[in-house]
Structures are given as C-alpha cells and as structure tokens.
Curated annotation (Swiss-Prot):
GO cellular component, one term: host cell mitochondrion
Keywords: Host cytoplasm, Host mitochondrion
Superkingdom of the source species: Viruses
Chief location: host cell
Identification of the protein by name: Non-structural protein 6
Amino acid sequence: MNRLLQRQLFLENLLVGVNSTFHQMQKHSINTCCRSLQRILDHLILLQTIHSPAFRLDRMQLRQMQTLACLWIHRRNHDLQATLDVINWISP
C-alpha cells in the first residue's frame, strides 16, 4: 500500500470516528443553531467542490473541518457572530 493510500485510509477512519462522536452528541445536546451551521457548511463545501476537480480526500478534509467547527461552536456560546466567524475561518 503506497503512502497516499495509507494517508487516505487513515483520514477516512479518523473522519468516521469524529462524525460518530458528533452524531452521538447531536442526539442529546446540540442546539438548533449548530444544526443550522451544519447545513450552511454542507452547502459551502458543495459550492467549493462541485466546480473543481476535488479529490475525495479534499472533500473529507473539508467535512472534517466542518464537523470540528460545529463541535467548537457548541462548546462555546451559541452566538450568530461566532458562527459567522467560524464559517469565514474555515472557508478557503
């Protein structure tokens, strides 16, 4: 297995773990604003990757940043400006 394939497999496994944790939390405590943030970021990721020859790995990395941003927002205050700041920060 070459190095790039190993890296991709590692990131896929990491992402599954991060998403699993996020969805377990979501069932119990993630507020509506966090779910809204998730939808906004899903849309941004789609816009950023639909017109470019993005590799699967690029999409996964964007998705991972999105999930971590949602967790970050949830742990902090549920504040619109903070949400917008995070969106600006993770958007290339």
